[in-house]
Amino acid sequence: MTDVKKAKVSLNNAKKNKFKLGVNSILHMEGVNPALVEIAYKAIEITPIDFGIPSTGGYRTGIEQKFLFHKGVTKADGLVKRSKHQDGLALDFFAYVDGKGSWEPEHLTAIAGAFKESAKQLGYVVEWGGDWPNFKDLPHIELVTTPGGDPLKVEKTATLAEPKIKEKNDPETDGDEEV
């Protein structure tokens, strides 16, 4: 069974857990887009593996980003190539297993599944660094935004039905708004 399939099975088998974001993780999300924070709170409720947000896992200033770039931790230097962290649109996470931090791929994959499912349930779109084709960043999740910078929203319940065109004098579509 592949890691992705294991993570899906693990996520599907997860019961309501007792995990909560710790004080430090909450503080590390300061400056992060509220939609992504909401997704993180939902993810901790459904994840099969506890997780936290490291000190550099939320919003980053240009100086913080450049420092991490020079340490070789990130490919974005913060100036020429900005990170989504600099706009508050990304979070990094780590697994918390047996009282210790873990960056094992199977743990991070399961947690990413919880983030994706949470975003879907809340009507948002996220992108996981583990899905990137050229560079795998397993502990990274980012909020997909519109060109204007707003969180991309999708319908929580998809439907194949055609939208109704508003007609005058039709009780199903006639309302106060103009066509």
Model region roles, listed by residue range:
Residues 75-81:
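Alpha-helical scaffolding within the catalytic cores
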Residues 13, 25, 29, 34, ...:
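Short linear motifs in intrinsically disordered/low-complexity regions
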Residues 81-179:
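Catalytic cores and adjacent binding grooves of peptidoglycan-active enzymes
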Residues 2-54:
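Active-site acidic/histidine clusters and adjacent loop/turn architecture
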Residues 36-40, 65-66, 90, 112:
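A general structural signal for well-ordered alpha-helical packing
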Residues 26-34, 59, 102-109:
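Soluble non-cytosolic domains of exported or imported proteins
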Residues 41-75, 121, 129:
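Extended, low-complexity, intrinsically disordered C-terminal regulatory tails
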